[in-house]
Each structure stands twice: as C-alpha cells, then as structure tokens.
A protein has these predicted regions:
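Non-catalytic scaffold segments within catalytic domains of secreted glycoside hydrolases
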Residues: 2-67, 73, 77-79, 94-410
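Active-site gating/metal-coordination segments in enzymes
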Residues: 85-88
Length: 410
C-alpha cells in the first residue's frame, strides 16, 4: 500500500485468544547485529491487482522499473541504500495453473546481484492470476505452490541472506477487499473470512519457502494504526480501542496465538515490518489526527508496543507521503525511529515507500510520493531535491556511528 491510497484499517478485535507455547525460529531471535545490508531502504511499488473496471495494474511496468532496473539500483548508491523491497508479479509468472515463468523476477534479481543490492521479496502483493478465486482452497494451494517454486529459484539463483514475505499487508487486503470493497475482491461483510484465508495461505506458503530455504527469514509487513474515541462517550472509546488493537490480529493469527486452527505458530514470524503513513491515525469513524494535535500518538510508542507484544526484530517496511510534505514526514519518522532505538527497541531499518513516483491506482494521476520521478526516455529520473537533502541531513548523523551500536536488547 502506498500513501496515495487511503486510511488503513483492520477489523474489530476478536475474543477468545488462545495462548500456546512459544517456539521462535532461529531467525526470529532479537539481535543487536544489523539484519539488513542497509538501514535506509527503498521500496519499489509492485501492486498488480485488478480494478473494478477490469483493468489490471502493474506498477513495476507503469513506473518502468522493469525496463530501467539497473539505473534505478545504481542511483541508490548516492544514498547508501543497499536493501530494497520488491514483489513477484504473480499474473505474469503463472498464466496457467502450475506453469511458471519467473523471467520477470529474474530480471530484478540479476540486476540486484550486479549492483550488490539485497532484496526483501513479497510473494503476494495484492494481485493474483485471473483463473483463481481468492476465497477458494485452490487459491491457497496456488500461493503455496508459487512460494515453493520461488524458494527453489532463490536457492538456485542466489546466495547469502534471503528475506521473503509470503503475503503483504493481510490486514489491509482483508479490510479493503473484504469489508470496504475498495480493492479486489471488492466485497463487503467478508473481511474476517478473507483475513483467515490470507493467514492460512500465508502460513502454508511460509512453510513451503522454508522447506526449500531453511535459513529464509520470513517477513510480515502490516499496517500500524492509532484510533481515538470520543472521551465523552465510553462506548465510542471502547469501540475505538477494539478497532485500534485489531492491527495485531494478523500477527496474532500467524503466530497461532489467535485461531490456532489456521496453522500458525511462533516460527512463522521472524521479522515484523511496520507500515506507517501520515494518515494512520484518526478519530473513531472520523477525521484524521494530525501531528501536533494532543491525541496524536508518537510513532516511537507504537514501535514499542509492537515490540513488547512479539519480541521480534522490527523495521519500518513502508513510510512516506505526498508532495511538499515528504521531507518533513521523513524527518519525523527517522527521528522517532532513532528515539525508539535509543530506548532499546530493535528497529533495523526504514524503507521509503514508494521510492518512485507512480500513477494513482484509480485515476492514473501523477502521485508525487517518491524520491525520484517518472523515467525519461533514457531512464534518467529527476530527484526531488528537498527530500534528498533531508535524507542526507538525517542519515549523515548516523554514518559516523555504526547503527548496531545503538541497538539494545530490552
């Protein structure tokens, strides 16, 4: 999800949490050693879902990242970025059930190898082939098979650390696709059903990845939110808190703490990705809460709450905003992350998402939300200087201090 979309929401918190003995995977152990090749990271928007009018999006193609990937990666060096987020374009890879063409992913993978770039891959990032129904058992089977095939590909074509998210933003897809009809499959009243399906599928796909790559580090990116109720209305306060804590449901299900019948356990959750935008806080069923307002919750507190609940290494998997607010927003998030680290929270990175301006999902409008603009015919992209300057200003403070010295266990 990019900042040009909408507020992120989950679903009302479920009751009947089941506690199970916790058995973390080796990769999930909290460490003071940096996990990623770089702390500052870049996310290449890769959504491929279909719109209500039947048009399929392909943001990798519309930003021409597939065409100019070498130039895109070479530009990252100017900012010390060595870690990126990319996604599989499932509709291109599996045009017929069980027949796989990974050429679109190999183009990205081999460019990354040429430039010394480390990739955090999403297997599923909102889009799937036309022949599948996301609510069906066959969809879960297909995602599991795709993950296994991709694991085999990574084993054959890459070395070193591998980071993979089976499903990106379970909560957002379940809300937007299952309750708000904002995104494919455009349903209402099926959010809980869709969330369970995505969790069940993610668990199976994660196990398929690990069967091929025992040392794979499984990443789970989810939106974090803050919602405030009307203090004069106790029912509204309770409703807001239930809504707010729904942001934990996907992670709770993946770990088997909630609905263990879906197959989750603690070993599925290695690294938590926290997705946080400038519209992720709002009044219950009301307006956005902005920074500077008394009800706005500091991001460092959200990071602490997530860490204390799961005791996993964290990174900011997505953050950004549009237009002239970009530099100020980056500075805010960066400073909050540094404050969290200083307080002992193991945050291992900040990913600017998206790193490239892109066409709007619904209207193709020019979204000025990246560090670089649309590609010119020769592949050159104009940098947004105010954001570039703010990035250099903030990151220069850290370059003389290796960031592992700032990470502390709590």
């Amino acid at each position: 999800m990019s900042p040009e979309t909408t507020n992120v929401a989950g679903h009302l918190r479920e009751r009947g949490r089941t506690r199970r003995p916790r058995k973390f995977s080796k990769a999930a152990q909290v460490t003071n050693t940096p996990i990623f090749a770089s702390f500052l990271q870049a996310g290449f928007e890769c959504s491929t879902h279909k719109l209500k009018n039947g048009k399929r999006l392909d943001l990798v193609a519309s930003t021409q990242h597939d065409r100019f990937v070498d130039l895109d990666y070479s530009r990252l060096r100017d900012f010390g970025i060595q870690t990126v987020r990319e996604g599989l374009r499932w509709h291109l890879i599996e045009r017929e059930r069980g027949r796989y063409d990974f050429s679109s992913a190999l183009t990205i993978l081999r460019a990354a190898q040429r430039h010394g770039i480390e990739i955090i891959w999403d297997v599923f990032h909102f889009g799937w082939p036309d022949f599948l129904d996301i609510f069906s058992a066959e969809w879960a089977n297909a995602l599991t098979d795709l993950a296994g095939e991709f694991g085999r590909l990574l084993r054959a074509e890459s070395s070193g650390k591998r980071f993979v998210a089976a499903v990106n933003e379970i909560s957002f897809v379940a809300w937007g696709g299952g309750d708000d009809a904002f995104i494919n499959p455009f349903c209402k009243g099926r959010g809980h059903e869709l969330k369970r399906q995505l969790v069940r599928s993610s668990v199976r796909a994660s196990r398929a990845l690990r069967s091929e790559l025992p040392d794979v580090q499984l990443v789970s990116p989810e939106p974090v939110i803050h919602i405030v109720g009307d203090p004069a209305r106790p029912d509204d306060v309770r409703s807001a808190e239930a809504y707010r804590t729904s942001m934990f449901e996907a992670w709770d299900m993946l770990t088997g703490r909630l609905h263990p019948e879906l197959g989750g356990d603690e070993s599925i959750l290695d690294i938590i990705g926290v997705n946080f935008y400038d519209r992720n806080q709002w009044w219950n069923f009301g307006q956005t809460i902005h920074r500077g307002e008394p009800e706005y919750r500091p991001f460092r507190e959200i990071l602490r709450e997530v860490y204390c609940r799961y005791r996993r290494p964290l990174f900011v998997a997505e953050t950004g905003t549009e237009n002239a607010d970009r530099p100020d927003w980056f500075a805010y998030v960066w400073d909050e992350v540094q404050a969290a680290i200083a307080a002992g929270i193991p945050v291992h990175g900040v990913c600017l998402y998206p790193i490239l301006n892109h066409p709007g999902w619904e209207d193709d409008r020019h979204c000025y939300n990246g560090l670089w603009d649309y590609a010119e015919p020769d592949g050159n992209r104009k940098v947004y200087d105010p954001l570039a300057e703010e990035i250099r200003r903030r990151t220069s403070k850290e370059r003389s201090i290796c960031y592992e010295s700032k990470l502390r266990s709590t």
